[in-house]
């Protein structure tokens, strides 16, 4: 068996969404900050293509690269690679990374609770892991500051007409739309149509509304979050959502950054108060338990500090290799599984 490279991966999923973790075989990319390192990964694309493209990956997969932290307060840094983006932050991926770090012993586990600080490209995140019998059973993450951007904006979408949307940031950027307003219901049997409509809405939102982060070089809307109405039981709000990820797939988890963005919008509209909780439910019925912990400012904008809580499970280990005679060293994409590819 010969190979010019060997990349060691621990497989993981958080509430259904795959977030594998590279634990060896890749040198840290250049950059003075984790954000700069993530921009190198995004522009270079060599690693992204190798681990995400077929035959080694697929559109279903997210992969995280562990890197030494740049901030002395953090125990570990990580860079998130999604099918179409290398984002500032991801809730499900941060839960996967935390679980792999503890379950594999890379960071020593302390039962019943392990606390650590991780450095995502978008900033530091505080992690609290509930641990028992050598397993990180639940991960709570204090997400990066999240904020509402545009509220009740009108958006023209081909085939849908004029719809009303909100835009917000929860560690990544979202256009948020009510499912009923576009004639949809969030259920597994409508996954393909939800994904395709969501990507179409994202494209229209980028063209007509745009987005600009006040501090990071993040100037586009990444995702469409399709929601069903929130219900309230005391100080607990519950809402079903699904997030369409380019090129056209649905997040299997409730999307931690999406829940954070949705809480920011609910707070901006006066529908959620500090200290209240939000249960986000995915298309699979899995849940993230969230809390609006406090308010703050980000670059002069009112923002919230959300906490996301969910579970993740290690699914296996693997080694990705490259035989020097392999005709597809960067892999490949076909439109049967990578929709909306340019012709």
UniProtKB/Swiss-Prot annotation:
Protein purpose: Catalyzes the epimerization of trans-4-hydroxy-L-proline (t4LHyp) to cis-4-hydroxy-D-proline (c4DHyp) in vitro, albeit with low efficiency. The physiological substrate may be different. Displays no proline racemase activity.
Active site per UniProt: 90
Binding residues for substrate: 91-92, 251, 256-257
Disulfide pairings: none
Record has Glycoprotein as a keyword: no
EC nos: 5.1.1.8
Catalytic activity from the UniProt record: trans-4-hydroxy-L-proline = cis-4-hydroxy-D-proline
GO MF terms, alphabetically ordered: 4-hydroxyproline epimerase activity; trans-L-3-hydroxyproline dehydratase activity
Family: Belongs to the proline racemase family.
Keyword annotations of the record: Isomerase
Protein name per Swiss-Prot or TrEMBL: 4-hydroxyproline 2-epimerase 1
Enzyme class: isomerase
Lineage: superkingdom: Bacteria
NCBIfam families, alphabetized: T3LHypDht
Organism of origin: Brucella anthropi (strain ATCC 49188 / DSM 6882 / CCUG 24695 / JCM 21032 / LMG 3331 / NBRC 15819 / NCTC 12168 / Alc 37) (Ochrobactrum anthropi)
């Amino acid at each position: 068996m010969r190979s010019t490279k060997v990349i060691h991966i621990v497989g993981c999923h958080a509430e259904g969404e795959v977030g594998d973790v590279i634990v060896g075989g890749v040198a840290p990319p250049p950059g003075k900050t984790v954000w700069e390192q993530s921009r190198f990964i995004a522009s270079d694309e060599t690693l992204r293509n190798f681990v995400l493209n077929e035959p080694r990956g697929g559109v279903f997969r997210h992969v995280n690269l562990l890197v030494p932290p740049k901030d002395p307060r953090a125990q570990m840094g990580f860079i998130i690679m999604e099918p179409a983006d290398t984002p500032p932050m991801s809730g499900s991926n941060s839960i996967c990374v935390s679980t792999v770090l503890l379950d594999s012993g890379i960071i020593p586990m302390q039962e019943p609770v392990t606390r650590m600080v991780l450095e995502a490209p978008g900033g530091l995140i505080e992690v609290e892991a509930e641990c028992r019998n050598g397993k990180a059973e639940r991960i709570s993450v204090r997400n990066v500051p999240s904020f509402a951007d545009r509220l009740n904006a009108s958006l023209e979408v081909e085939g849908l007409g004029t719809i009303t949307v909100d835009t917000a940031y929860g560690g990544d950027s979202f256009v948020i739309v009510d499912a009923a307003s576009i004639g949809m219901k969030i259920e597994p049997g409508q996954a393909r149509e939800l994904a395709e409509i969501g990507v179409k809405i994202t494209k229209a939102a980028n063209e007509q509304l745009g987005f600009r982060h006040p501090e990071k070089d993040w100037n586009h809307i990444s995702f469409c979050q399709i929601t069903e109405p929130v219900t309230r039981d005391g100080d607990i709000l519950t809402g079903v959502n699904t997030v369409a990820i380019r090129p056209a797939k649905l997040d299997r988890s409730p999307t931690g950054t999406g829940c954070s963005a949705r809480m920011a919008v609910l707070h901006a509209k006066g529908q959620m108060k500090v200290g209240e909780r939000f249960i986000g439910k995915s298309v699979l019925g899995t849940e993230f338990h969230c809390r609006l912990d406090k308010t703050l400012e980000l670059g002069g904008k009112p923002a919230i500090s959300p906490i996301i809580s969910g579970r993740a499970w290690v699914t296996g280990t693997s080694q990705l290799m490259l035989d020097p005679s392999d005709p597809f060293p960067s892999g490949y994409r076909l439109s049967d599984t990578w929709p909306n590819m340019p012709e």
